[in-house]
Design a protein with these regions (language model features):
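Active-site-adjacent helical/loop segments in soluble small-molecule enzymes
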Residues: 3, 97-166
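Glycine-rich phosphate/pyrophosphate-binding loop at beta-loop-alpha junctions
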Residues: 3, 7-107, 162-198
Length: 198
């Protein structure tokens, strides 16, 4: 049942790209808790564009960054994160990766990112206050982190190396996945209206 739900989300994202006239994203940014959704998204796009896959980035809460730590360890095995997994990205505060998802991710992800809370909060505010004709998106903290990581790579002077490593430029077609609304409306308002974690 869960795998069908994840598959349907990925197919929906692909359909939305087609409706917008996008044949192929150059970059895919997705959040991860245990890695099931990320594995499905990455696996789908790696298979669909196997001859020229998009650059794939997986974004985790730094307090629970088990996939990031697993990638850095370079053993091929999962590394668990224990202790206090305190983060505003409650949906990503897992600390233990899914073995099936990890098998896909370790072979197809270009960048694993350990993201602080401020990065997610900033993206929550960006989604809530779009520029021009862009639609407003109500995205909770767990859903916002891929945009936060992408925005940081593009606009933070200290992240120039990251921007280059991700091969982000004016021709990039970026897909960021958000799978969460304002699951905590009070916290959402504190972030968007009051600048919490700003």
């Amino acid at each position: 049942q869960r795998q069908m739900c994840i598959r349907d989300r990925v197919l929906e994202a692909d359909q939305q790209l087609k409706e917008m006239g996008v044949e192929r994203p150059t970059h895919v940014f997705v959040q991860a808790g245990v890695g099931s959704l990320a594995g499905a998204v990455v696996g789908y796009f790696a298979h669909k564009y196997k001859d020229n896959p998009p650059v794939m980035a997986v974004c985790e809460a730094s307090a629970a960054d088990c996939l990031y730590r697993s990638a850095v360890a370079k053993t091929g095995n999962l590394v668990n994160v224990t202790g206090d997994l305190q983060t505003i990205m409650a949906g990503l505060a897992c600390g233990e990766g899914n073995t099936i998802g990890w098998d896909i991710l370790k072979n197809h992800v270009d960048v694993f990112a350990s993201c602080p809370d401020w990065m997610s909060a900033k993206a929550t505010r960006i989604y809530a206050n779009p520029l021009g004709d862009d639609p407003r998106v109500v995205s909770g903290e767990s859903g916002s982190v891929p945009l936060g990581f992408c925005f940081t790579a593009l606009h933070d002077e200290d992240a120039k190396d990251l921007k280059e490593a991700l091969k982000l430029d004016e021709n990039s077609v970026v897909l960021v996945i958000s799978t969460e609304g304002d699951t905590d409306p009070v916290r959402y308002r504190e972030i968007v209206w009051d600048g919490l974690y700003g």
